[in-house]
Amino acid sequence: MAEAWFETVAIAQQRAKRRLPKSVYSSLIAASEKGITVADNVAAFSELGFAPHVIGATDKRDLSTTVMGQEVSLPVIISPTGVQAVDPGGEVAVARAAAARGTVMGLSSFASKPIEEVIAANPKTFFQVYWQGGRDALAERVERARQAGAVGLVVTTDWTFSHGRDWGSPKIPEEMNLKTILRLSPEAITRPRWLWKFAKTLRPPDLRVPNQGRRGEPGPPFFAAYGEWMATPPPTWEDIGWLRELWGGPFMLKGVMRVDDAKRAVDAGVSAISVSNHGGNNLDGTPASIRALPAVSAAVGDQVEVLLDGGIRRGSDVVKAVALGARAVMIGRAYLWGLAANGQAGVENVLDILRGGIDSALMGLGHASVHDLSPADILVPTGFIRDLGVPSRRDV
């Protein structure tokens, strides 16, 4: 199995591209419109440098931290992503990998596996919801998550409908039936490893979302749930406060890019915020999340935990984010490429890559712990930071 191991996230992406049908792979790299934001999410990290210490490195480094009360062995958690049809194990395989590496699993309400199965694989699971279907529907969804044992709730606000992608939108079928299988077979048959994995289970990729129905039921098709989300009016801050109170436990608001929104989130009583542009799948032209992080972190201080997602490909990226104010980062595409490349072991491989990179960067900076990191460790070029939602001088 030596050939199954990969050295970098970039290699995992290459293997995912080789092993997945084109339409499945395209769903992993898809982003809004021109893809300006998704490209900037990655490129922005390369603009940041380090200020290393040549003397004083310790022989052992502590990467552990906590996220919304959950102890994690490294400052990386799994971001919730929908319908993980890249591997038959899907979200359960990812949850097991996260548990094996000592971190939190984020489970999407658009996931293909029931929350009960995922929490059985990893008790440290945060359940994610969109503002979809109104208060009554959300109350049912949240109560099921509570009964299943979810230890945190994530509310995603940074996803809007993209009206055009220059490379084309992913061709996701409405449901997986015989007609669909026959239509996709010419594409799938060119990827025998992927096809054989599903053939062994005697089940095609599941495009239903079981966590949007009652326990034990298959749930609605993906696009039925997606349509309900599109038809639901966006939430108000009062809605966010209501949902936080309803949940009554650790509560993260995902998608905060502006200082004024971050302050409103604090007022709403959230436990954590994630600086995020939904991996470039929101409003194209939004700055990279790492550019917005320093201003948001400075604005809220220690009133709430601040996380970041978007563009994480290396352990050094994680270190840059933590130094600039993040408690931890959330990864999405990186672990999905690992899942496609080698199932659960591939996700563990990705987490190991990030762990090794974090450790190496800490050593180079002369720090014994991720908690020792600060902005002084990072070279930030002039004009890099985007302080969105801050009144300009002429407005003051």
Curated annotation (Swiss-Prot):
GO molecular function, one term: oxidoreductase activity
Disulphide-bonded residues: none
Keywords assigned by UniProt, alphabetized: Flavoprotein, FMN, Oxidoreductase
GO cellular component, one term: plasma membrane
This protein's record includes keyword Oxidoreductase: yes
Coiled-coil spans in chain: none
Pfam families: FMN_dh
InterPro entries noted in UniProt: Aldolase_TIM, Alpha-hydoxy_acid_DH_FMN, FMN-dep_DH, FMN_HAD, MftD
Active site: H278
Family: Belongs to the FMN-dependent alpha-hydroxy acid dehydrogenase family.
Protein's UniProt name: Pre-mycofactocin synthase
Species: Mycobacterium tuberculosis (strain ATCC 25618 / H37Rv)
